[in-house]
């Protein structure tokens, strides 16, 4: 059992919505661990735009063809969930120094609750440093073109949720002049 535990990581979040920053981190986590569970949180102090089922379904669509990556909803304490799933690693992403303080506190609390569950931090790829689910929702709600910042299925769902038609008004599109090195969206 202990040999298997280090090969499985849990990457938790609300994923409301899933962004390309999340996708990048999950893929990179999969390069380190044999399996990564994308654990979609049911219990959140935030009021999600998408239901738990919608968030799980969108993530499942994104990772459908990715071996070793599964998506599951979870509720309750993250460390309890990780333990139930046989994982002793929680994978977390850091965008900036401002993320570190909060993530550090969470990691220490999780360690206090379950000493054998470790938190592993990965730095976000530089091209995703500025995005968050909150910023994505704010831009999308005002008609901003967030294409390429979220997977295509999430992009479509955001457009539907906010009632914006296709195709987008080119005047609302984000500039992509400096984004030539960004990978295409899924």
UniProtKB/Swiss-Prot annotation:
Pfam families per record: CTP_transf_like
Entry GO terms, CC: cytoplasm
KW Transcription (keyword) present: no
EC number(s) reported in the record: 2.7.7.3
Subcellular location: Cytoplasm
Binding site for ATP: 14-15, 22, 93-95, 103, 128-134
Chain positions of site Transition state stabilizer: 22
GO molecular function annotations of the record: ATP binding; pantetheine-phosphate adenylyltransferase activity
Record-annotated membrane-spanning stretches: none
Residues noted as binding substrate in the record, renumbered to the chain: 14, 46, 78, 92
InterPro entries the UniProt entry points to: Cyt_trans-like, PPAT, Rossmann-like_a/b/a_fold
Domain of life according to the entry: Bacteria
Reaction catalysed by this enzyme: (R)-4'-phosphopantetheine + ATP + H(+) = 3'-dephospho-CoA + diphosphate
Biological processes per GO annotation: coenzyme A biosynthetic process
Pathway linked to the protein: Cofactor biosynthesis; coenzyme A biosynthesis; CoA from (R)-pantothenate: step 4/5
Cofactor(s) listed in the protein's UniProt record: Mg(2+)
Keyword Glycosyltransferase: no
Record keywords, A-Z: ATP-binding, Coenzyme A biosynthesis, Cytoplasm, Magnesium, Nucleotide-binding, Nucleotidyltransferase, Transferase
Family, as annotated: Belongs to the bacterial CoaD family.
Known function: Reversibly transfers an adenylyl group from ATP to 4'-phosphopantetheine, yielding dephospho-CoA (dPCoA) and pyrophosphate.
Subunit structure: Homohexamer.
HAMAP family: PPAT_bact (MF_00151)
The protein's name: Phosphopantetheine adenylyltransferase
């Amino acid at each position: 059992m202990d040999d298997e535990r280090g090969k499985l990581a849990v990457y938790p979040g609300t994923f409301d919505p899933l962004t390309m920053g999340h996708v990048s981190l999950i893929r990179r986590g999969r390069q380190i661990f044999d399996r990564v569970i994308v654990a979609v949180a049911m219990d959140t102090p935030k009021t999600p735009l998408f239901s738990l089922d919608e968030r799980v379904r969108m993530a499942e669509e994104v990772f459908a063809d990715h071996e070793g990556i599964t998506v599951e909803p979870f509720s309750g304490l993250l460390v309890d969930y990780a333990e139930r799933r046989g994982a002793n690693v929680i994978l977390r992403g850091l965008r900036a120094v401002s993320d570190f303080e909060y993530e550090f506190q969470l990691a220490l609390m999780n360690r206090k609750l379950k000493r054998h569950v470790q938190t592993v931090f990965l730095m976000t790829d530089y091209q995703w440093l500025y995005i968050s689910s909150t910023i994505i929702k704010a831009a999308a709600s005002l008609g901003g073109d967030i294409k390429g910042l979220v997977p295509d299925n999430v992009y479509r769902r955001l457009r539907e949720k906010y009632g914006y038609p296709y195709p987008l008004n080119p005047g609302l599109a984000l500039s992509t002049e400096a984004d030539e090195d960004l990978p295409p969206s899924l």
